[in-house]
């Protein structure tokens, strides 16, 4: 009689074995370039994020708070998303919406023998948390209560918007992978349009709900872009090493 297997542990084990096997097949220099780029990028990003947070703290009483209040009320009246639509569109940026995307992308890229992409996915997710928590630990800014009496705004950590950072980094990585894989300029154009709309609508949802000040969202977009540039640069440099070493390998080379 065939011995039964627990599907989830067996699947995770199989994915891990594939990842390990393919990882060992890559040039050591590729992983070295990947790690070094991430380490330097994380250090620089952390310094920039800390600096931006300290600047925003200093500017709060010098006009930033008044500017935020003015523009949040303007966005309340002119935001293309209603409050109820904001509830829907903020979902891709929360844990419930993002974790399945993260685990699926990591599992698929590991299973289909793209260890650099799988590792970059993990680094992207963990790194964005590190940067957000660095800023939150530096400044626990109060959330707005100007829309619906602040019903959709938790009490702490307004700057930056964590939803916006995670959407910019994780979905930004997905759109980047799609863009670099396509040979069609028309498709690449569609990727840019779709990425702009997707990230933009999630960002606007946080303002529609009154969950963040406008400067929180702007800072989230910038910090997320900073980390996205870091991880995609690390992936590009490592992929370039693989391509030089094994020109005919399956490593996904940017066009």
Across the structure, where does each feature detected by a protein language model lie?
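Hydrophobic, membrane-inserted alpha-helices
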Residues: 83-84, 100-107, 175, 199-203
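N-terminal transmembrane-helix/juxtamembrane module of multi-pass inner/ER membrane proteins
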Residues: 1-97, 139-152
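Short hydrophobic alpha-helical membrane-embedded segments
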Residues: 93-100, 192-197
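Aromatic-anchored segments of alpha-helical transmembrane domains
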Residues: 51, 126-133, 197-206
